[in-house]
């Protein structure tokens, strides 16, 4: 009998993320991604759902925006003169850790979503903010690991499996308590 996932186990999962039109919007590589169950490295509902499964299981999890990347916030979209960005020839897709002249220090990154007429649109929302997403999860491997056997720096969680920011994480955790 295959053991059920427990808090602290190292779990390797293959994840495919779908939008509501059944388009794949992201997925892990073939090797999957390894995370520590119950360590709150992924969305709270995903973390909780993993604890109900075992190696070899496949399951779907639908997350609303407030359980994953948050609602789209227009206040996080800024129109900035390109000469204030400090880069030559800014292009769509470029990332910035902050916006010059905008007092924001929450660790949020910004991405240029449009450039034209000497101006750039920088968006601090996660690309999937406001989206309801379906996560198709396959549990590939479960390993019992003793405390201290693996450093947290050895675990890499892709952005599409992590809560976008602390306020979204708190809201998602609150929904679990209801």
Residue ranges and their predicted role:
Residues 1-178:
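FKBP-type peptidyl-prolyl cis-trans isomerases
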